[in-house]
């Protein structure tokens, strides 16, 4: 199943950058074919790419390495189109974790389709960890006062994005604040008692105010339970252990 997705990636790249509609199949290759294989004799994170007049051969030690090799081949097609200069590449990552951190709490809330496009870009550049930061931009079930004027990401969308990333060997990691950066939440009538600033919900909005007074009052005995509730709702949506 994984190889099918990578073949579709390559097929789409050839269509867009070389103007070629190339079908794919399984079985014994012929002259002129591009061949994708997992070779367990190679180290798990390594792939070799050979572009010769008679064929293109991509061998990888694992599905993840095969995916990375396809990204390299796609980059080469983007640069050269349908006429690819011959080359041989042996490649592997120097860093086990290659991460990207995205703040989804400022400005417009990204749609799922857009986030999938981001995942495709991260996959192209072999990024394998994506930390997704949210505040009021996730639909916490008991915090409708904080997100009702926005279009927050839902649990179903997060789980779908997690599956989409996993298929591209990207670990989607949950990220949320547990102390500060909670203006939209702590300025609601439901949660204002947890704010360090008394009567915070009565103060008109300003960016200075939002930046200075959006911190949990840690002396409030309910603060810890509140934070644990946020984590318990958001964390299970991800397959990541982080």
Roles of regions detected by a PLM:
Residues 95-242:
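Substrate-binding cleft of carbohydrate-active enzyme catalytic domains
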Residues 1-98:
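Contiguous, structured surface segment used for ligand recognition
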């Amino acid at each position: 199943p994984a190889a099918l997705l990578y073949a579709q990636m390559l097929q789409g790249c050839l269509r867009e950058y070389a103007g070629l509609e190339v079908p794919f199949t399984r079985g014994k290759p012929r002259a002129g074919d591009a061949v994708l294989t997992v070779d367990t004799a190679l180290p798990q994170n390594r792939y070799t790419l050979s572009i010769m007049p008679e064929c293109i051969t991509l061998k990888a030690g694992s599905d993840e390495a095969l995916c990375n090799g396809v990204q390299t081949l796609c980059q080469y097609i983007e640069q050269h189109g349908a006429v690819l200069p011959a080359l041989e590449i042996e490649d592997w990552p120097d860093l086990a974790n290659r991460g990207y951190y995205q703040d989804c709490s400022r400005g417009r809330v990204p749609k799922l389709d857009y986030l999938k496009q981001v995942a495709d870009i991260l996959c192209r550049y072999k990024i394998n960890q994506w930390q997704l930061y949210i505040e009021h931009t996730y639909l916490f079930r008991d915090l409708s006062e904080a997100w009702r004027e926005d279009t927050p990401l839902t649990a179903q969308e997060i789980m779908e994005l997690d599956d989409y990333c996993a298929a591209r060997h990207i670990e989607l990691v949950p990220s949320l604040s547990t102390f500060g950066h909670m203006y939209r939440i702590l300025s609601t009538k439901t949660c204002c008692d947890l704010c360090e600033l008394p009567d915070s919900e009565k103060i008109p909005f300003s960016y200075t105010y939002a930046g200075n007074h959006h911190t949990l009052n840690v002396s409030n005995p309910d603060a810890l339970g509140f934070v644990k509730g946020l984590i318990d709702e958001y964390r299970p949506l991800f397959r990541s252990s982080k």
